[in-house]
Protein backbone atom coordinates (compact mmCIF):
# COMPACT_ATOMS: atom_id res chain seq x y z
CA UNK A 1 0.00 0.00 0.00
CA UNK A 2 2.76 2.47 0.90
CA UNK A 3 4.58 1.76 -2.37
CA UNK A 4 1.53 2.91 -4.38
CA UNK A 5 0.74 6.00 -2.31
CA UNK A 6 1.10 9.35 -4.04
CA UNK A 7 0.24 11.61 -1.12
CA UNK A 8 2.36 9.88 1.48
CA UNK A 9 5.08 12.19 2.85
CA UNK A 10 7.65 9.40 2.66
CA UNK A 11 6.80 8.82 -1.00
CA UNK A 12 7.11 12.53 -1.71
CA UNK A 13 10.48 12.69 0.03
CA UNK A 14 11.64 9.67 -1.92
CA UNK A 15 10.62 11.27 -5.21
CA UNK A 16 12.40 14.51 -4.29
CA UNK A 17 15.54 12.58 -3.38
CA UNK A 18 15.37 10.64 -6.65
CA UNK A 19 15.01 13.85 -8.65
CA UNK A 20 18.02 15.37 -6.86
CA UNK A 21 20.12 12.25 -7.48
CA UNK A 22 19.28 12.27 -11.19
CA UNK A 23 20.11 15.97 -11.49
CA UNK A 24 23.40 15.68 -9.61
CA UNK A 25 24.38 12.56 -11.57
CA UNK A 26 23.80 14.42 -14.82
CA UNK A 27 26.02 17.26 -13.59
CA UNK A 28 28.87 14.97 -12.66
CA UNK A 29 32.00 17.05 -12.17
CA UNK A 30 30.01 20.13 -13.17
CA UNK A 31 28.62 20.46 -9.65
CA UNK A 32 31.59 22.61 -8.62
CA UNK A 33 31.00 24.95 -11.57
CA UNK A 34 27.30 25.05 -10.70
CA UNK A 35 28.14 26.12 -7.15
CA UNK A 36 30.40 28.88 -8.47
CA UNK A 37 27.69 30.09 -10.86
CA UNK A 38 25.15 30.21 -8.03
CA UNK A 39 27.51 32.18 -5.82
CA UNK A 40 28.40 34.65 -8.59
CA UNK A 41 24.72 35.26 -9.34
CA UNK A 42 23.92 35.83 -5.67
CA UNK A 43 26.86 38.24 -5.37
CA UNK A 44 25.59 40.15 -8.40
CA UNK A 45 22.06 40.31 -6.99
CA UNK A 46 23.32 41.50 -3.61
CA UNK A 47 25.41 44.20 -5.30
CA UNK A 48 22.56 45.35 -7.57
CA UNK A 49 20.09 45.53 -4.69
CA UNK A 50 22.60 47.45 -2.55
CA UNK A 51 23.11 49.93 -5.41
CA UNK A 52 19.37 50.57 -5.31
CA UNK A 53 19.25 51.24 -1.58
CA UNK A 54 18.56 47.76 -0.20
CA UNK A 55 21.28 47.12 2.36
CA UNK A 56 22.50 43.60 3.16
CA UNK A 57 21.35 42.58 6.62
CA UNK A 58 24.60 40.82 7.49
CA UNK A 59 28.20 41.27 6.42
CA UNK A 60 28.97 37.56 6.54
CA UNK A 61 29.93 34.89 4.00
CA UNK A 62 27.03 33.40 2.04
CA UNK A 63 26.51 30.90 -0.75
CA UNK A 64 23.49 31.56 -2.94
CA UNK A 65 21.11 33.29 -0.56
CA UNK A 66 21.38 36.37 1.59
CA UNK A 67 19.19 38.62 3.72
CA UNK A 68 18.52 42.18 2.61
CA UNK A 69 16.72 45.08 4.27
CA UNK A 70 13.92 46.58 2.16
CA UNK A 71 11.88 49.47 3.54
CA UNK A 72 8.22 48.44 3.87
CA UNK A 73 9.17 44.89 2.84
CA UNK A 74 5.66 43.36 3.12
CA UNK A 75 4.18 46.03 0.83
CA UNK A 76 7.08 45.79 -1.62
CA UNK A 77 6.78 41.99 -1.69
CA UNK A 78 3.06 42.18 -2.53
CA UNK A 79 3.79 44.60 -5.36
CA UNK A 80 6.55 42.37 -6.68
CA UNK A 81 4.27 39.33 -6.55
CA UNK A 82 1.62 41.23 -8.52
CA UNK A 83 4.28 41.78 -11.21
CA UNK A 84 5.06 38.06 -11.32
CA UNK A 85 8.18 37.97 -9.15
CA UNK A 86 8.88 35.55 -6.33
CA UNK A 87 10.68 38.07 -4.10
CA UNK A 88 11.97 35.72 -1.42
CA UNK A 89 11.09 34.84 2.16
CA UNK A 90 9.84 37.62 4.41
CA UNK A 91 11.94 37.20 7.55
CA UNK A 92 9.48 39.29 9.56
CA UNK A 93 7.10 36.33 9.45
CA UNK A 94 9.59 34.45 11.63
CA UNK A 95 11.45 37.17 13.53
CA UNK A 96 9.75 40.42 14.59
CA UNK A 97 13.04 42.33 14.59
CA UNK A 98 13.44 41.58 10.86
CA UNK A 99 10.07 42.97 9.73
CA UNK A 100 11.69 44.84 6.82
CA UNK A 101 13.99 42.03 5.74
CA UNK A 102 13.80 39.47 2.96
CA UNK A 103 15.87 36.35 2.26
CA UNK A 104 16.76 36.35 -1.45
CA UNK A 105 18.10 33.32 -3.32
CA UNK A 106 19.74 32.97 -6.74
CA UNK A 107 20.36 29.73 -8.62
CA UNK A 108 21.56 28.69 -12.05
CA UNK A 109 17.98 29.24 -13.21
CA UNK A 110 18.38 32.99 -12.61
CA UNK A 111 20.26 34.91 -15.29
CA UNK A 112 22.03 38.28 -15.04
CA UNK A 113 19.27 40.05 -17.01
CA UNK A 114 16.65 38.67 -14.61
CA UNK A 115 18.68 39.83 -11.63
CA UNK A 116 18.91 43.34 -13.06
CA UNK A 117 15.18 43.39 -13.81
CA UNK A 118 14.41 42.15 -10.29
CA UNK A 119 16.62 44.81 -8.69
CA UNK A 120 14.92 47.49 -10.82
CA UNK A 121 11.50 46.14 -9.82
CA UNK A 122 12.42 46.20 -6.12
CA UNK A 123 13.54 49.82 -6.41
CA UNK A 124 10.37 50.75 -8.32
CA UNK A 125 8.05 48.95 -5.90
CA UNK A 126 9.79 50.47 -2.88
CA UNK A 127 8.89 54.02 -3.96
Identify the role of each PLM range.
Residues 1-52, 56-59:
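Active-site C-terminal subdomain of aminotransferase-like
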Residues 4, 15-16, 22-29, 63-64, ...:
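Short, glycine-/Ser/Thr-/acidic-enriched flexible segments
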Residues 44-52, 75-85, 121-125:
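Generic non-transmembrane alpha-helical segments
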Residues 53-56, 86-92:
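A short linear hydrophobic-aromatic micro-motif
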Residues 54-83:
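Conserved PLP-binding catalytic core of the aspartate aminotransferase-like
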Residues 79-82, 93-127:
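PLP-dependent enzyme catalytic core of the Aspartate aminotransferase-like
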Amino acid sequence: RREKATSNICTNQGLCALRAIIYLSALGNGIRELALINHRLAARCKKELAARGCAPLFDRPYFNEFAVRIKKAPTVMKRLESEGYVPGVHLGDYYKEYKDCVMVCCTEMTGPAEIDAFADAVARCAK
